[in-house]
């Protein structure tokens, strides 16, 4: 057998749970890259990870590199022999260096001449002699932001390392990893399992589970936790809220998962469920349980890392731990209810938003005015928008949000309802921050959209206005996210808003705060750049985006319509020919000095092909005008695609730059007219 399975395990102290998957995946990727570089064939490779170990398993790994022939080229034949045909010193030196005589060399003929060459056979190195060094290099390249040292060793890693095991089949690979000598001993679960001697790479998972009480396969452990949590929730008539991020973290915290169900006092359900869920998931790593109507139940599911003889004791312990946190939430909620959001407005004057842009009170005053302005343009209730904007940051001054920061906006919504604010105002309190992350939904309620846009635009214009635009990866005010949010809200709700108008209004509301005279232009450019990034993420071809960007449409909903239209046009059979023709037209018109002619004189249409093109354009223009007016760009481009034959024939038969000045100008006017029809939508000459 010319191959064996390889197992490498690193036994450590508890690894950071949020980094565990990335560490394991990177270890595997780095090691397989090493195998490829070393020309070592293998069938497949997988990673394993648990809180106190990283491991990789490579199946059917070649036991040695394949032998290979290495071509060693010597001097040119013309300089390898003298006039009498005897080898020169250069030829003899080269031959001696390769352990041969000159007459043993072969000859290689190329287009640059004839050369001496020696095809040396290089025997492959045994795999076992390469593994330790490759594994160490793979570990050295792991993404570890803050490595640490332990004991007296100078070795650094993310956590202290206690064991290293490298087995190729049943053979122990000699060597060290991070200063630890490779050995067969594998540690088990800290409390339940026992350590053992690993006899063969193939037995790693089985022995670790049976003797060590560790499920090393991360994905299996994750699936087990999810399935058991769902079953546990179903037993009490509910559904577990299992977000993947939390499931990943819990999976990374346990080696032997045991899913248990606990409860808390029903009185806590009087507190908004978001606050309870926040502390259960964020602080305790518990899975909340909801009924079929989406109402929080007084239960939670947690995952223990031990199989106890008395699970009731573990359940009681977790209930005891979570109770004070829920009691805190209850206390904060009851205390906050004693004061309205409006009464908290003066306290916003004590919180600085940004040194040059004023306090949070200044910010909400601007948001209120800008939200009302936006609402007037979109048909939303401007009074509600102004009110929601004014109150938008008041929940930041509540005890609940100060303690549970991720509940900002959500608690504002609950407090607004308790204060008797309109539902539109209350909903806007929560939705003002949307979208919070890539893939998050955008607000859809009209007032919410106005407030969310106002908040983001105020920040964008303000920060650019004081000359603190994002540089490189640094973006302390999350302006890129704010910009994408502005575009998505307008596009996905098809709002009739113009960026230039919005930016100008936001700048006006900042008054004399802004020192950057170019702020409005810079914000617009920034938003246009975000358009490109957003559409690229959606899979839109770059040339389609550039074709639309060339027209600088500043209404995002209109921009989106053009993108969709050009994407559709690109799929039409005529698109490539018309794109090429537009490029040709663009080049011709670019060479014209002075103002381009625009009037077509039918009497000067001498050739049949130019008559046909002019007639086709004249036929289409009355149909195109209403389509352009209604932004039905897709239908407009579909109609324009019918020009292909006429355009092709024109360039086949007509000399545009005729000697006759009148004929030339008439043809230029025809081409200018043709190009202008396409430019109503995009510059399709940029399509590849």
UniProtKB/Swiss-Prot annotation:
GO terms for cellular component: cytosol. Gene3D superfamilies: Isoleucyl-tRNA Synthetase, Domain 1. Its main location: cytoplasm. It comes from the Bacteria. InterPro entries: DALR_anticod-bd, Gly-tRNA-synth_bsu, Gly-tRNA-synth_heterodimer. Keywords: Aminoacyl-tRNA synthetase, ATP-binding, Cytoplasm, Ligase, Nucleotide-binding, Protein biosynthesis. Tetramer of two alpha and two beta subunits. This is Glycine--tRNA ligase beta subunit. It comes from Shewanella sp. (strain ANA-3).
């Amino acid at each position: 057998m010319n191959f064996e399975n390889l197992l490498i395990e690193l036994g450590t102290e508890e690894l950071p749970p949020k980094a565990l998957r990335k560490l394991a995946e990177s270890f595997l990727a780095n090691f397989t890259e090493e195998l490829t570089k070393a020309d070592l064939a293998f069938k497949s490779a997988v990673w394993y990870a648990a809180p106190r170990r990283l491991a990789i398993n490579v199946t059917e790994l070649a036991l040695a590199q394949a032998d290979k022939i290495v071509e060693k080229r010597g001097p040119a034949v013309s300089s390898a022999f003298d006039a009498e045909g005897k080898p020169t010193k250069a030829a003899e030196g080269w031959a001696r260096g390769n352990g041969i005589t000159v007459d043993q060399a072969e000859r290689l003929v190329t287009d640059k001449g004839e050369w001496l060459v020696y095809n040396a056979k290089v025997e492959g190195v045994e795999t076992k002699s390469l593994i330790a060094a490759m594994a160490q290099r793979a570990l050295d390249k792991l993404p570890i932001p803050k490595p640490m040292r332990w004991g007296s060793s100078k070795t650094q890693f993310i956590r202290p390392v206690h064991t290293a095991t490298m087995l190729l089949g049943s053979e122990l690979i000699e060597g060290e990893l991070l200063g630890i000598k490779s050995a067969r001993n594998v540690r088990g679960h800290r409390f339940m399992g026992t350590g053992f001697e690993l006899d063969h790479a193939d037995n790693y998972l089985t022995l670790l589970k049976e003797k060590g009480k560790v499920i090393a396969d991360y994905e299996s452990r994750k699936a087990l936790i999810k399935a058991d949590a769902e079953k546990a929730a179903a037993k009490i008539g509910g559904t577990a809220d299992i977000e993947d991020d939390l499931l990943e973290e819990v999976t990374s915290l346990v080696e032997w998962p045991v899913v248990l169900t606990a409860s808390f006092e029903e009185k806590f359900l009087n507190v908004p469920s978001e606050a309870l869920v926040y502390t259960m998931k964020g602080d305790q790593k518990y899975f909340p349980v909801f009924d079929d109507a989406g109402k929080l139940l007084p239960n939670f599911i947690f995952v223990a890392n031990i199989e106890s003889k008395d699970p009731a004791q573990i359940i009681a312990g977790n209930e005891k731990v979570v109770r004070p946190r829920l009691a805190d939430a209850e206390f904060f909620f009851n205390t906050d209810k004693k004061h309205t959001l409006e009464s908290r407005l003066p306290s916003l004057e004590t919180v600085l938003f940004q040194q040059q842009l004023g306090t949070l009170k200044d910010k909400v005053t601007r948001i209120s005015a800008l939200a009302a302005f936006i609402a007037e343009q979109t048909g939303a209730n401007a009074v509600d928008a102004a009110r929601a904007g004014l109150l938008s940051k008041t929940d930041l001054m509540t005890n609940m949000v100060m303690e549970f920061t991720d509940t900002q906006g959500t608690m504002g919504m609950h407090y607004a309802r308790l204060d008797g604010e309109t539902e539109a105002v209350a909903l806007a309190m929560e939705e003002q921050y949307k979208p919070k992350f890539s893939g998050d939904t955008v607000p859809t309620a009209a007032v919410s959209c106005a407030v969310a846009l106002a908040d983001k635009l105020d920040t964008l214009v303000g920060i650019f206005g004081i000359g603190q635009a994002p540089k490189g990866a640094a973006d302390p005010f999350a302006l890129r996210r704010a910009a994408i949010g502005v575009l998505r809200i307008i596009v996905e709700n098809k709002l009739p808003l113009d960026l230039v108008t919005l930016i100008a209004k936001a700048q006006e509301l900042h008054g004399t705060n802004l020192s950057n005279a170019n702020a409005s232009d810079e914000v617009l450019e920034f938003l246009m750049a975000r358009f490109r990034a957003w559409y690229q993420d959606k899979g839109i071809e770059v040339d389609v985006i550039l074709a639309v960007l060339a027209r600088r449409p500043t209404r995002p909903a209109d921009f989106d319509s053009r993108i969709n239209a050009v994407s559709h046009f690109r799929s039409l059979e005529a698109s490539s020919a018309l794109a090429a023709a537009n490029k040709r037209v663009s080049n011709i018109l670019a060479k014209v000095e002075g103002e381009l002619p625009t009037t077509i004189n039918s009497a000067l249409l001498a050739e049949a092909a130019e008559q046909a093109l002019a007639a086709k354009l004249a036929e289409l223009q009355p149909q195109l005008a209403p389509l352009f007016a209604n932004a039905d760009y897709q239908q407009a481009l579909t109609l324009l695609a019918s020009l292909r034959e006429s355009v092709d024939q024109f360039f086949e038969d007509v000399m545009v730059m005729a000697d006759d000045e009148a004929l030339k100008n008439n043809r230029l006017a025809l081409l200018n007219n043709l190009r202008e029809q396409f430019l109503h939508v995009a510059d399709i000459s940029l399509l590849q």
